[in-house]
Amino acid sequence: MLYVLLILAVLIAGILIVASTKPNTVHYERSSVINAPPEKIVPHLIDFHKWEAWSPWDKLEPDMKRSYSGAANGVGAKYAWEGKKKAGAGSMAITEVNSHGVKVDLRYIKPWKAECIARFHFTPQPNGTDVRWSMDGPNTFMGKVFGLFMNMDKLVGKDFEIGLAGLKTAVEKG
């Protein structure tokens, strides 16, 4: 029995040591070309009411509680959500809009607390606009441990890819 406990203690210590070497910040990013100029894309990003048409997280729990405050759109627009199972809870605020993109401050409450910055950056292309969606934030110790067992870039990146595909559809059909 003592031998099993010793092995377990060594495994836990190893996991904690490896986790402590992971970066203190995270960065996730995906991009997609949308067949439209930035001025056609921006309205879908600066009005949180329009996010329901393309956001991957809105589809997790279509009946989640939503609230909107601040400006109707653009800088100062705010959105909060509270899901019962999958979507968690948090809030977003648009803090910057310019010809190169949109910046959104995110505050997660559930399933864990975190503050991140999401950016939508526009790069003109011959056939439209390359929209790069990125998110940067702190990598907590528990996040580092979790990251040892789950590929967070793959998980978050998949959501970004789904969201960008939905945004592309919303803009191009718009």
What residue ranges belong to the model's regions?
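Hydrophobic ligand-binding cavity/cleft-lining segments
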Residues: 3-71
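Solvent-exposed, acidic/flexible segments
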Residues: 34, 44, 87, 153, ...
